[in-house]
């Protein structure tokens, strides 16, 4: 079995966890890894719009995080079907403490944004973001030291995906977490937009039409002042990705 794993450096903490996982399977699987941080042409050629993309045997594409259980099934020739995560979003906006996300508190997202509560993965993400962002990476919605939601960004000119790139454009890398109970995303995104308007004129994001990942869904963005720029990629049976934007 062959795996081609494309990843955007340490933009997502799961990337580091996945690379560590591969060490355990290097004698069982033909694994090739590609960091697209500086290779925009490669990201475009494989139609990459997630922080990581797995291609199995040069054919089957997976966007979900890889786990040992999945790799073991694949090694046993078991069929693994990736399904979109679709929920009814809670409408009531919930506001805890809205605080800046920085290198000093990025460890807080480890329980929600990693597969193994890996603080080390988050530290690597902080090093990555420090190359491209100011001191503030985004904003968190926090209650009792528990991260409820968050919004993160990077300048569009550093994004390897095939999106509009300009010094005046920001890109929303992560918007989390979607819930059936409350809207935890609204307030951190609102605070991030206020922060970014001092430097940028527009913010772009990628979202699925109906699924929760990435950042989704489209209707949520439309209800919060974003404009649908159209479909940029479609993964049959899994997602239809839209580019959305908002003048700030």
Go through each PLM region and give its residues.
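Conserved active-site alpha-helix within GNAT-family acetyltransferase domains
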Residues: 209-230
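Conserved GNAT acetyl-CoA-binding A-motif
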Residues: 196-212
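A short, internal acetyl-CoA/4′-phosphopantetheine-binding micro-motif in the GNAT/acyltransferase core
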Residues: 173-184, 209-210
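Conserved acetyl-CoA-binding loop-helix of GNAT-fold acetyltransferases
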Residues: 181-197
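Local sequence-structure signature of Cys/Sec-based thiol-disulfide redox active-site neighborhoods
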Residues: 1-26
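C-terminal "cap" of GNAT-fold acetyltransferases
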Residues: 231-248
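Conserved beta-strand in the GNAT
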Residues: 140, 146-159, 171, 176
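Non-catalytic, surface beta->alpha helical segment in thiol-disulfide oxidoreductase systems
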Residues: 57-84
């Amino acid at each position: 079995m062959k795996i081609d794993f494309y990843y955007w450096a340490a933009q997502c903490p799961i990337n580091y966890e996945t690379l560590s996982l591969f060490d355990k399977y290097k004698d069982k699987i033909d694994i090739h890894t590609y960091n697209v941080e500086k290779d925009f042409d490669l990201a475009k050629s494989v139609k990459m719009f997630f922080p990581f993309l797995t291609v199995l045997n040069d054919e089957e594409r997976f966007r979900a995080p890889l786990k040992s259980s999945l790799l073991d099934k694949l090694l046993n020739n078991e069929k693994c079907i990736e399904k979109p995560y679709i929920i009814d979003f809670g409408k009531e906006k919930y506001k805890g403490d809205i605080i800046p996300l920085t290198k000093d508190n990025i460890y807080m997202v480890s329980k929600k944004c990693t597969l193994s509560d890996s603080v080390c993965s988050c530290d690597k993400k902080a090093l990555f973001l420090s190359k491209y962002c100011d001191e503030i990476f985004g904003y968190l919605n926090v209650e009792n030291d528990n991260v409820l939601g968050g919004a993160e960004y990077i300048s569009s000119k550093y994004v390897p995906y095939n999106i509009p790139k300009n010094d005046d454009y920001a890109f929303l890398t992560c918007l989390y977490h979607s819930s059936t109970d409350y809207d935890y995303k609204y307030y951190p995104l609102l605070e991030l937009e206020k922060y970014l308007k001092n430097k940028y004129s527009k913010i772009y994001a990628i979202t699925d039409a109906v699924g929760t990942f990435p950042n989704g869904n489209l209707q949520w963005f439309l209800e919060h002042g974003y404009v649908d720029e159209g479909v940029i990629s479609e993964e049959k049976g899994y997602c239809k990705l839209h580019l959305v934007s908002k003048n700030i």
